[in-house]
């Protein structure tokens, strides 16, 4: 019940001296795109726009390639030359909604939804993707804000005044945090996060061992289960729990990206629904927007990936959560950007395996 993202927060800047690039990210209708990603490809660093689409990022002298991203929109790449005499630059960025083409695909002698073959390949490759790195390190820049939105009359009578007086928890108050985590991974599955810096106004009752930064970077959808017991759409048993529908594809940098609708077969289990975008040929996660709901939680999680040495790694997480627990209502939003990747590819997994699908059409 702790965390999250402040509406108007300062953008993440590159921690170097230099000139400032500022601007606003909008869609074609002129509406701001909140929390869009600004990525400096040659520096392996980036920033995030605020809730009004505004951004500011420091750039050192030199040539830079800037990539602007927002989920569901085509990335925009721009080049800039920063001189010693350069002052503040201002760009107005417009991102176009990603157009997907719905192509008819035949599998075997019969027609079937292309999502079936795509997801079979994704599921087959999931164990490979979990082993293709020996190690990596990165920094996770996090911003969050949340608040207690409501308290039942009964709970208010029982503990309302005590919570406010002793714990500093007050309905309607916004609690914010900003922090930097050092993330390290070593195979087979040892991932650690160390809090480098952390600033927040969270009441003591909402802090967890003085390190309230959520470990969203430890969430891996290639694993069969997420958050303990939620079935991943890439689980070996995913077809028992989900229906998949092909929504179309688009091409980016010569690679085909396919978009898949994910729908749970049962409403009585904790399952995801939403969309999954897949990099074909490597069968890697490009992005997703997935939602799950149960008696106490209503959660939406979005993730965007980018390639590093041929491996598609997460660069942005966006977590929205609405809670209703024991008479308390709360909401929060938590943004995490991963920067400064240093990865060591497992030499045994440099060459991607060829997937041969053998199925009998009936």
How should these model regions be labeled?
Residues 36-40, 66, 107, 138:
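Hydrophobic beta-strand segments
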């Amino acid at each position: 019940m702790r965390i999250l993202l402040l509406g108007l927060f300062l953008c993440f800047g590159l921690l170097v001296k230099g000139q400032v690039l500022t601007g606003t990210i909008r869609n074609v209708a002129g509406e701001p795109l909140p929390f869009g990603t600004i990525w400096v490809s040659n520096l392996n660093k980036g920033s995030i726009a605020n809730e009004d689409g505004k951004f500011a990022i420091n750039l050192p002298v030199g040539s830079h390639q800037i990539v602007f991203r927002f989920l569901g929109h085509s990335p925009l790449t721009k080049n800039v030359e920063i001189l010693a005499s350069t002052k503040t630059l201002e760009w107005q960025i417009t991102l176009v909604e990603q157009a997907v083409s719905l192509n008819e695909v035949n599998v075997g002698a019969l027609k079937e939804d292309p999502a079936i073959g795509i997801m079979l390949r994704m599921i087959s490759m999931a164990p490979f993707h979990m082993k293709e790195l020996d190690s990596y390190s990165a920094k996770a820049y996090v911003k969050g804000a949340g608040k207690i939105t409501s308290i039942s009359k009964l709970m208010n009578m029982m503990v309302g005044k005590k919570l406010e007086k002793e714990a500093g928890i007050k309905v309607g108050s916004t609690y914010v945090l900003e922090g930097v985590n050092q993330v390290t991974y070593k195979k087979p599955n040892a991932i650690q996060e160390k809090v480098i810096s952390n600033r927040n106004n969270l009441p003591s009752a909402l802090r967890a061992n003085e390190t309230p930064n959520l470990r969203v970077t430890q969430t891996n959808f290639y694993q069969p289960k997420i958050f303990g017991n939620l079935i991943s759409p890439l689980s070996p048993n995913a077809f028992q729990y989900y229906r998949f529908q092909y929504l179309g594809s688009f091409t980016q940098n010569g690679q085909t990206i396919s978009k898949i609708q994910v729908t749970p077969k049962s409403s009585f289990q904790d399952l995801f629904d939403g969309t999954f975008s897949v990099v074909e040929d490597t069968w890697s996660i490009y992005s997703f927007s997935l939602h799950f709901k149960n008696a106490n939680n209503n959660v939406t999680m979005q993730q965007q990936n980018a390639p590093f040495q041929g491996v598609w790694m997460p660069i942005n997480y966006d977590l929205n959560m609405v809670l209703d627990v024991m008479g308390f209502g709360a909401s929060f939003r938590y943004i995490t950007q991963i920067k400064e990747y240093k990865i060591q590819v497992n030499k045994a997994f440099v060459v991607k395996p060829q997937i041969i699908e053998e199925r009998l059409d009936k």
